[in-house]
């Protein structure tokens, strides 16, 4: 796998969970001898929702909710076969979305 790169993109609602998963990936990749760049924090996406509390008249009574989506990017440079096998066997938390791209 000479001159290749694995880009791993992580998304989660909980920043502690995503940081823990990123550190597990970094430890696994370094243990197999690959070079890791990251984790690089990307901008947090904040979605806000405003809901009317009153069913009828009171327009002033509202509740606001938000969801924050945290993102991280990791690049694994010059991965070997051991690195790919170790990453495939890695068990990450259920609340983390993982996208892997081989370039």
UniProtKB/Swiss-Prot annotation:
Gene3D superfamilies xrefs: Ribosomal protein S10 domain (3.30.70.600)
InterPro entries according to UniProt: Ribosomal_uS10, Ribosomal_uS10_CS, Ribosomal_uS10_dom, Ribosomal_uS10_dom_sf
S-S pairs: none
Top-level division of the source organism's lineage: Bacteria
SMART domains reported for this sequence: Ribosomal_S10
Keyword tRNA processing listed: no
Biological processes per GO annotation: translation
Record's keyword terms, sorted: Ribonucleoprotein, Ribosomal protein
Any one Gene Ontology cellular component term annotated for this protein: ribonucleoprotein complex
Entry's Gene Ontology molecular function annotations: structural constituent of ribosome; tRNA binding
PANTHER family xref list: 30S RIBOSOMAL PROTEIN S10 FAMILY MEMBER
Family, per entry: Belongs to the universal ribosomal protein uS10 family.
NCBIfam families: PRK00596.1, rpsJ_bact
Function comment: Involved in the binding of tRNA to the ribosomes.
Subunit structure, interactors included: Part of the 30S ribosomal subunit.
HAMAP family reported in the protein's UniProt record: Ribosomal_uS10
Protein name per the record: Small ribosomal subunit protein uS10
Source organism: Stenotrophomonas maltophilia (strain K279a)
Lineage, top ranks: Bacteria, Pseudomonadati, Pseudomonadota, Gammaproteobacteria, Lysobacterales
Name of the coding gene: rpsJ
């Amino acid at each position: 796998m000479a001159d290749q790169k694995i880009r791993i993109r992580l998304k989660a609602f909980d920043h502690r969970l995503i940081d823990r998963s990123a550190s597990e990936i970094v430890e696994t990749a370094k243990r197999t001898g690959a070079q890791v760049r990251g984790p690089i924090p990307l901008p947090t996406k904040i979605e806000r929702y405003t809901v009317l509390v009153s069913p009828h008249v009171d327009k002033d009574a509202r509740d606001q909710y938000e969801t924050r989506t945290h993102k991280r990017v990791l690049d694994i440079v010059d991965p070997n076969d051991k690195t790919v096998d170790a990453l495939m066997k890695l068990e990450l938390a259920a609340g983390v979305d993982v996208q892997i791209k081989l370039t």
